[in-house]
Amino acid sequence: MKPCLLLLALLLGGCASLDTPRVPSQALPAANSAFGRDLQAQAAAYQGRSGFRLLPNGGEAFRARAELIRNARTSLDLQYYIVHDGLSTRLLVDELLKAADRGVRVRILLDDTTSDGLDDIIATLAAHPHIQIRLFNPLDLGRSTLATRTLGRLFNLNLQHRRMHNKLWLADNSAAIVGGRNLGDEYFGAQQDLNFTDIDMLSVGPVAEQLGHSFDQYWNSALSKPIGEFLSRQPTASDLAETRERLVRSLIAWRQRNAALYQRLADYQYHPRMDTWRRELIWAWNQALWDSPSKVLAQDEPDPRLLLTTQLSPVLTSVHSELMMISAYFVPGQPGLVYLTGRADAGVSVSLLTNSLEATDVPAVHGGYAPYRKALLEHGVKLYELRRQPGDRSGSGPHLFHSGSSKGSDSSLHSKAMIFDRQKAFIGSFNFDPRSVLWNTEVGVLVDSPELAEHVRTLALQGMAPALSYEPRLEAGELVWVTEDNGQIHVLHREPGSWWRRINAWLTKRVGLERML
């Protein structure tokens, strides 16, 4: 196709759209629902503190989302970077539709990368009178084909490479889930080939209202547009009914095809655990942190006043004894290198758990991280790179955080957490890399609780264990990797990882893509 014709196709692909009303809305008061009032009554005894429970297990993280849908009476607000199709997603969509049937207002805000080529399917759900769906930072033109979408993003790369990386699940403005998980089987231990090890956190009380303010800022931003704006025809009630019938049939087929997986995921329907989790809550002071949605509009580096990192800066600079970090995608850049080595030089014990080359799902990011290893190690920063954790068919392979992954599946790190002086812990969507700092928007919660911090620290130490990780060290100025197999310590002089991964990581270094990672 000639350039002029391709440009014409791009323009025509965005012309056939409808003028969809964009009405501002806000989170509904927690007191409007029985569930919200019940949680408010539980929180009242803690005088402004919020309640937290970690969800490091993929099965629990899925169950918590499903149970929050079932408990919701007035509102559900969902904000996600990625939504992948699969059994877990279909079960959650089925529950969301049932919640909408009983009058719950459902607002779903998706980063536009989620909806590439799926506008009609996603919009069909919005045909329900109680479901609203918006896209953040959408591609306005050329959505009709893969070629025109790709060209459209290239024409406006400065804006289109900036994404909403937030992950938030909020029920009745009174209970929320924050953390690193997107939506898809691989995030809930339900994928057959690869699952992500991650950390979420159930958060109830005042913190949920803070996170509700965060959601409202994004929902009402000029960057968030109703899915209907990108359709040539609005889905009807009959379209929705047909979609629901297909959904039910697909769930029946899933149950017949993989009964064990279906029963494991659907167990929330028969054995709810919300009451148990509420008894296990750790009550503590906290601060919900998020980037301003207008961060993505910056022409170059964003205004520091808009950033989550600016809000987190006081605790980053005041750490004095121990800093532990879990960052699946770690690229410190020069500012991060100066910060981490400066803390280590000041006597702070600094340790980091990230993915190894063989485990990462994005080898290019490893290419951005690898050049910093020697400098970090020379200043005493401890590095641990999670090994690819193969699960054999009997399920005996090691799995970090007791993830409950499908038997036979490998595991890769996707977690994002920081522990400061064994006193405070930060859980959210933020990776220690330029993309989280400069380009994408993020959300998380800083909790002031030695008890919770110790729980997160224990998870970090579990991942840093020799049997689960490679520890890079310097021997005569060269990198070696120390690990353990069958109780025996081994020193590797060549970094583990396939030739394809090595080439991918090497190309990233050669091309100089660090600031985009």
Residue ranges and their predicted role:
Residues 15-167, 171-517:
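Charged, low-complexity intrinsically disordered terminal segments
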Residues 4-13:
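Bacterial N-terminal signal peptides
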